[in-house]
Amino acid sequence: MTLIELEQIFKKKGYDMYNFARGIDNRPVQISRERKSVGAESTFISNVYFDSDELNEHIKDVVNDVCKRLDYINKCGKTITIKIKYADFKQVTKRITLKSPIYTYEDIFKNTNILIEKVKNKEKQIRLIGVTMSNLLECEKEEYHNISLFDKL
């Protein structure tokens, strides 16, 4: 239908319907839900094996991205999920829920590697690695202060 026909039938709503049907919607996006997870993933240019240096570098990059995203929204997570997609496009996920929330690179990297060890298959090549933090909570990050032994002398 033409714009004129829609406006004759539906009045002002006809104009909106005409634009919506063409993917045009200039209303501001209202985000009304709270984020439930933060994740990142990386696809390899060519498939790699579990014991490759390239996999380890991608894991570091993905965990770093997750940490930055957690920091940006000031959240910590209790559940870590890894996703591994193999060269044959079969996919496996593994997760662990911790007693306390974490947010540091070291903690997320350590737990990611624990999960990877549980699904490791040295004979299969990997196409993609992903890490997601969920069960998010407001983060009260500890401030670390350097304490000198000589302050009290």
Regions found by a protein language model. Give the residues of each.
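DNA-contacting surface of Y-family translesion DNA polymerases
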Residues: 1-126, 136-152
